[in-house]
């Protein structure tokens, strides 16, 4: 009778451990899979699509835009901003300043964009800065 009781105890422990082990493995797999999903959702791409869409609707309310066209415009905006920032950084370095001000941005826009486009960009930028300054006071 004693051997039967001893057999029962290890037998009852072994299946419990065995049943827990696969659950842990499955749980580990689930966490890894859900962890991957969480990582994917956390890595957001910042785009200008919503702003481009708003401007499009202001200019042409009945016109749509494809995803490919939106991607191209987003790349264009990123490229222009990168060029302006780079040029403004160079201008600040030439003048031995550590801060990029609106003056450096304005000058870099004049250097990068041609003719009338630069004039319009500068006037719109000045208008936006004025509007922002008046709203913060």
Swiss-Prot record:
Residues 1-46 are annotated as: Disordered. Its main location: nucleus. It is found in: Nucleus; Chromosome. It holds the Pfam family Histone. This is Histone H2B. The modification N6-acetyllysine is found at residues 8-9, 13, 24. GO terms for cellular component: nucleosome; nucleus. InterPro entries: Histone-fold, Histone_H2A/H2B/H3, Histone_H2B, HISTONE_H2B_site. Belongs to the histone H2B family. There is a cross-link at residue 131 (Glycyl lysine isopeptide (Lys-Gly) (interchain with G-Cter in ubiquitin)). Core component of nucleosome. Nucleosomes wrap and compact DNA into chromatin, limiting DNA accessibility to the cellular machineries which require DNA as a template. Histones thereby play a central role in transcription regulation, DNA repair, DNA replication and chromosomal stability. DNA accessibility is regulated via a complex set of post-translational modifications of histones, also called histone code, and nucleosome remodeling. The lineage of its organism: Eukaryota, Fungi, Dikarya, Ascomycota, Pezizomycotina. There is a cross-link at residues 8-9, 24-25 (Glycyl lysine isopeptide (Lys-Gly) (interchain with G-Cter in SUMO)). The modification Phosphoserine is found at residue 12. The gene is HTB1. Keywords: Acetylation, Chromosome, DNA-binding, Isopeptide bond, Nucleosome core, Nucleus, Phosphoprotein, Ubl conjugation. Monoubiquitinated by the UBC2-BRE1 complex to form H2BK123ub1. H2BK123ub1 gives a specific tag for epigenetic transcriptional activation and is also prerequisite for H3K4me and H3K79me formation. H2BK123ub1 also modulates the formation of double-strand breaks during meiosis and is a prerequisite for DNA-damage checkpoint activation. Phosphorylated to form H2BS10ph during progression through meiotic prophase. May be correlated with chromosome condensation. Transmembrane segments: none annotated. The nucleosome is a histone octamer containing two molecules each of H2A, H2B, H3 and H4 assembled in one H3-H4 heterotetramer and two H2A-H2B heterodimers. The octamer wraps approximately 147 bp of DNA. GO terms for molecular function: DNA binding; protein heterodimerization activity; structural constituent of chromatin. It comes from Gibberella zeae (strain ATCC MYA-4620 / CBS 123657 / FGSC 9075 / NRRL 31084 / PH-1). Signal peptide: none annotated. Residues 1-10 have a biased composition (Basic and acidic residues).
């Amino acid at each position: 009778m004693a051997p039967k009781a001893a057999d029962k105890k290890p037998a009852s422990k072994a299946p419990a451990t065995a049943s827990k082990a696969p659950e842990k493995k499955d749980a580990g797999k689930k966490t890894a899979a859900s962890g991957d999903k969480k990582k994917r959702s956390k890595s957001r791409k910042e785009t200008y699509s919503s702003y481009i869409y708003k401007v499009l609707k202001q200019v042409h309310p009945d016109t749509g835009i494809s995803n490919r066209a939106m991607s191209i415009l987003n790349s264009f905006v990123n490229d222009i901003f990168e060029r302006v920032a780079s040029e403004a950084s160079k201008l600040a370095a030439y003048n031995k300043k550590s801060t990029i001000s609106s003056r450096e941005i304005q000058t870099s826009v004049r250097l990068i964009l041609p003719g009338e486009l630069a004039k319009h960009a500068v006037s719109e930028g000045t208008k936006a800065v004025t509007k922002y300054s008046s709203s913060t006071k």
